[in-house]
Amino acid sequence: MSFIYGLQSAARNCFFFRFNLLTNWRKCNTQAVTSRDFHQVKINHIVNKSLGLGVNHGDRWTPLPENFLFYRTFNTKRKGCLLSSRSKEIWMISRKCTAWTDSFSRQLPMKNVPVVPAHSMSHPLNCLPTRDIRSFHTSPRCQAAPAPLLLMILKPAQKLLAIIVGRGIRKWWQALPPNKKELFKESLRKNKWKLFLGLSSFGLLFVVFYFTHLEVSPVTGRSKLLILGKEHFRLLSELEYEAWMEEFKNDMLTEKDARYVAVKAVVHHLIECNQDIPGISEINWIIHVVDSPDINAFVLPNGQVFVFTGLLNSVTDIHQLSFLLGHEIAHAVLEHAAEKASLVHLLDFLGLIFLTTIWAICPRDSLALLGQWIQSKLQEFLFDRPYSRTLEAEADRIGLQLAAKACVDVRASSVFWQQMEFAESLHGHPKLPEWLSTHPSHGNRAEHLDRLIPQALKIRETCNCPPLSGPDPRLLFKLSMKNFLEAEKEDLNITVKQKMDALPIQNQKQIPLTCIVDKRTGS
């Protein structure tokens, strides 16, 4: 567990420590820490030979800026890359002014830097709570796609009505005498073409309804189903926002809190650098930081951003936080909540038809209940969850592009999910199949991001971002894992040897050979 201790301690201290480095590069009075140095801290924690920022230094005071801006070179030819710097020469001067060789060196000076204590941890097991890791999602499962309040209330009533109607049809059919049943069947055979025409008309209306409610996303170019109006859905988002504020009213950080300032700076920088993305400038983005150990973050469709401090304690650096917030912003810009709610309502409507049919044709209530359960599970695992995973993958792709345009080190995006996967395995959690979850597995997300990183790096180049320097954080993470496993193996061998040495050894009394010979000869 020493690795998690080192990882989280370094995350909590270096996360705020790096914000200080982002703001003081022109002053030349801050000791620079490169990406290699930072990851060496984690390795040193693993082998308990800390050479730099370690656990013993966890209670030092570290400054945190009120805001920061990433460096962007001015380029009038590329309107897609909004800029926030004076010129590329500033960045070159900064590289000469400080030994900071990581991509964080492209920062502008800040003012009014508040001072906050970096939190230290008393026990390594407290760094990544087991419950929080297993339930971690960057978007809450239920709240990512809020349904209309009226339909949420009527949904159980609709199912109950479908069951009553289906069961009533079955009872009516069972109560009919045999001769009337034959007459009814004969009537159906005579009017089979009328019945076929009626069903075909219903199916045609359904298809027309579906295609007339398709909209093409201006960001991805993908067609999506939107049944609810935007204004209607925004009103529902306001209702959900009020519910969240009521729940977290006692846990909200103030706007002067350093963690709030940090999150606000990251979000505003991402928004500023992606003003050309359709929909971003139309949303009023408001940040809320919740003081909670849960590792979570989500954005409501109306631009209300909720970030939990547990997530801030879990990210290694500003790059990981920028990607995660970019992922959540992508959810809002792509209108995933409205899209998911529309699909759910459409499937629920079809489900009511199947539910009525199941209760009508099943001869017993027990079989009808079994059929209803099978139908709900098929809908959940064949449509709901796969579609949710598809939306998550799309948000990862667009969020990575948003982070790339903000000159973030996009290589750190996959490292976060590798850390989460390793933490789960370290806690002994069973690896559940991905099809059981609404989100892709941590390992699959990391692999998906690794495939997208080359394209994101090209986006950084087109936006004239400074080139990334220093070692690849993915390579450093693998090195950390290797050192951790070797250290764990060495510690295990030492523990076994100590236990063996501690076992009581019975001293056998040595019998002289002459005594044995004398006994055998009988002398």
Swiss-Prot record:
Its EC number is 3.4.24.-. Residues 165-195 are annotated as: Stress-sensor region. It comes from the Eukaryota. Autocatalytically cleaved in response to mitochondrial depolarization both at the N-terminus and C-terminus to generate the short active form (S-OMA1). Autocatalytic processing at the C-terminus takes place at residues 447-456. The S-OMA1 form is unstable. OMA1 pre-processing by AFG3L2 may participate in maturation before OMA1 autocatalytic cleavage. Degraded by YMEL1 in response to membrane depolarization. Protein turnover is regulated by prohibitin (PHB and PHB2), which promotes degradation of OMA1 in a cardiolipin-binding manner. May form a redox-dependent disulfide bond. Exists in a semi-oxidized state and is activated by prolonged hypoxia. Residues 1-45 form a transit peptide. Binds 1 zinc ion per subunit. Residues 148-167 are annotated as: Cardiolipin-binding. The chain crosses the membrane at residues 196-216. One of its GO terms (cellular component) is mitochondrial inner membrane. Its cofactor is Zn(2+). One of its GO terms (biological process) is glucose metabolic process. Disulfide bonds join 407-465. Protease activity is activated upon autocatalytic cleavage in response to mitochondrial depolarization. PROSITE patterns: ZINC_PROTEASE (PS00142). Gene3D superfamilies: Metalloproteases ('zincins'), catalytic domain. It is found in: Mitochondrion inner membrane. It is a single-pass membrane protein. Belongs to the peptidase M48 family. The stress-sensor region regulates proteolysis and activation. Homooligomer. This is Metalloendopeptidase OMA1, mitochondrial. It comes from Bos taurus. The gene is OMA1.
